[in-house]
Amino acid sequence: MVLITVLANLLILQLSYAQKSSKLVFGGDECNINEHRSLVVLFNSSGFLCAGTLINKEWVLTAAHCDSENFQMQLGVHSKKVPNKDEETRDPKEKFICPNRKKNDEKDKDIMLIRLNRPVSNSEHIALLSLPSSPPSVGSVCRIMGWGTISPTKEIYPDVPHCADINILDHAVCRAAYSGWLATSTTLCAGILEGGKDSCHGDSGGPLICNGQFQGIVSLGRHPCGHPDEPGVYTKVFDYTDWIQSIIAGNTDAACPP
C-alpha cells in the first residue's frame, strides 16, 4: 500500500520532472480501462520518467532516451488516484541499447529493451502487446496512449491515460517539419496533418499501435504539440524485431540495423 501511494504521488508530480524530450497525448479521450493493458510506467524517486510497453512476461520496450539510473516500472496502472488490485512493480534486471547508437544523438536508434527482475502474468489489467508481423503502410490509422498533458500549451495532466487515433504519414512530412533531421527507414512519421492530436511531453517510450500490433515507440515531437503539418517521429519497431528477439533468446551481442 505504501508503494502504491508513493507511485500515485510520483505520477501526480510527473510534469515537474518530465524530461524535455518527453511527449504526451494531446487531443485524445480517456482510454478504456482495458485497452492499455500493455502500457508500463517508468519512474524513479524524482518522479515520472517515461512510458514503456510489455512485449513478453519478462521484457519491456521503451525509448533509449528514457534511460535513467535507479528507475522502477509499474504495470496495470489506470488511475493515479485509484489503484488497480493487480498492479505490479518491477525493477530492471538488464537493459539493452543498440551498441552502434550515436551517444550524442538522442534521435538515433531510440529504442531500449528492459528485462524485468521477475516475470509478470496476464491479469485483468496486464497483458502483452504483439510485435509487428509487417510494417504499417502510409495512411494506416494507429492508436497512441499515455498520461501526458491534454493541452498543447499548458501543463494539464489527466488522472487516467488518454488515447487518440493518428495516421501514418509519408516521411517527407516529417522532413519538412524538422529541418536538419534526416528521416530514416527505422522511423515512422505519424500524426494528423490538420493538427489537433499528437503525442507530447510525458509519453516518450510509449506505444504506437496499428491493427493491434506494436508498430512504433514515441521518440521525437514538436512543442507545443498538435500543430498542423508537425507530426511526431516514432521508432519503427518492425525494423528492430530481429534484434529484440535475439536479445530475448540470449544473444546479447546482437546488432541493431544500421
UniProtKB/Swiss-Prot annotation:
InterPro entries: Peptidase_S1_PA, Peptidase_S1_PA_chymotrypsin, Peptidase_S1A, Trypsin_dom, TRYPSIN_HIS, TRYPSIN_SER. Its EC number is 3.4.21.-. Its main location: secreted. It is found in: Secreted. It is an enzyme of class 3 (hydrolase). GO terms for cellular component: extracellular region; secretory granule. Keywords: Disulfide bond, Fibrinolytic toxin, Glycoprotein, Hemostasis impairing toxin, Hydrolase, Hypotensive agent, Plasminogen activation, Protease, Secreted, Serine protease, Signal, Toxin. Residues 25-249 form the Peptidase S1 domain. Expressed by the venom gland. N-glycosylated. PubMed:17034951 shows that it contains approximately 10% carbohydrates, PubMed:10871053 shows that it contains approximately 20% carbohydrates. The active site is at 65 (charge relay system), 110 (charge relay system), 204 (charge relay system). Residues 19-24 form a propeptide. Belongs to the peptidase S1 family. Snake venom subfamily. Monomer. This is Venom plasminogen activator LV-PA. It comes from Lachesis muta muta (Bushmaster).
